[in-house]
């Protein structure tokens, strides 16, 4: 059986509609309003079965929000409300969100060649090939760099070989994504952690930090902080009246098909409303959606070993 180390997940138990204004927890302290499952007509035995399933699969923590309020919150083993845990590739969506902020502040444009920020020769491609790689290509996994050439996480120039013209091939490739961290830093003049703290962390009351591990820059936080970011996504970049991501066109693009090669991928965000999708580390096009049992409108930040933030806007989940 696959072992999950699930850091956070929005899960739908029913399509029962309980619409009301979104609630936002205070930016400081531990207070967070709750909503009883019984108020939503959810079955207690199914919740017990869910917790048993999560526990048997090595889950660390699980939170479900409805209208911004906590309906379910469960920690397993030694994991607690104050425990930090890695987001894995779910952190990609957080990075995409910050790229949007950097663009709205005129620090960069998605159509810019990445070389403007990473310097000439950041790849092992020819100058002409390299110049065609843009920030948008990094956001959409369409850099054209060879993801099967050695270590796919390696960000050293000699690891980044040409395989196809930028925009012509989709491949889940960590290295070009990771280099967006340097793009943000060079464009804004701030370290990635400092930019995150100023633009996202403090405005919504998160904790968390990026931490370099080998070639990867991995984000860590508590489950509740992950929930805060999920709530920010649910409200399209607005936190309790504070419009953090003002570029709504960017938010729409981030949570919509970004290219036709893999329609289930936006800007470092997975989409469930498509009839075909490609999976990481494969060139096979699969029929169906990434999560056929979930509502088609769901979009998700997804990381290995079950690090998920799933958003269903019509249900305020």
Identify the function of each model-found stretch.
Residues 1-21:
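Bacterial Sec-dependent N-terminal signal peptides
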Residues 68, 85-111, 138, 180-184, ...:
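Active-site SXXK
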Residues 140-212, 216:
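A small/polar active-site loop signature that marks catalytic segments
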Residues 50-79, 309-310, 316:
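A short, well-structured edge-of-sheet supersecondary motif
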Residues 164, 194, 205-313:
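Penicillin-binding protein/beta-lactamase superfamily catalytic region
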């Amino acid at each position: 059986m696959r072992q999950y180390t699930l850091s956070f997940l929005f899960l739908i138990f029913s399509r029962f509609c309980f619409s009301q204004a979104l609630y936002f927890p205070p930016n400081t302290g531990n207070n967070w309003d709750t909503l009883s499952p019984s108020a939503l007509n959810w079955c207690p035995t199914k919740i017990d079965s869910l917790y048993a399933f999560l526990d048997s699969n090595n889950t660390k923590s699980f939170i479900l929000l409805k209208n911004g309020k906590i309906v379910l919150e469960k920690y397993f083993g030694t994991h607690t409300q104050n425990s930090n845990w890695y987001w894995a590739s779910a952190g990609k969506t957080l990075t995409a969100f910050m790229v949007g902020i950097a663009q709205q502040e005129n620090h960069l444009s998605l159509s810019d060649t990445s070389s403007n920020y990473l310097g000439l020769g950041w790849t092992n491609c020819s100058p002409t090939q390299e110049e065609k790689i843009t920030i948008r290509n990094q956001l959409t996994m369409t850099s054209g760099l060879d993801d099967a050439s050695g270590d796919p996480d390696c960000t050293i120039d000699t690891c980044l070989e040409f395989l196809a013209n930028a925009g012509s091939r989709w491949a889940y490739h960590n290295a070009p994504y990771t280099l967006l961290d340097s793009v943000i830093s060079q464009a804004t003049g701030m370290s990635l952690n400092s930019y995150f703290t100023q633009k996202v962390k403090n405005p919504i009351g998160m904790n968390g930090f990026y931490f370099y591990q080998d070639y990867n820059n991995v984000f860590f936080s508590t489950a509740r902080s992950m929930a805060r970011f999920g709530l920010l996504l649910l409200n399209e970049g607005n936190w309790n009246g504070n419009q953090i991501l003002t570029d709504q066109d960017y938010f729409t693009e981030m949570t919509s098909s970004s290219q036709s090669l893999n329609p289930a991928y936006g800007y470092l965000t997975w989409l469930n409303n498509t009839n075909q999708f490609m999976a990481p580390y494969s060139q096979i096009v699969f029929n169906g959606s990434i999560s056929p049992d979930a509502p088609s409108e769901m979009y998700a930040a997804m990381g290995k070993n079950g690090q998920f933030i799933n958003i269903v806007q019509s249900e305020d989940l």
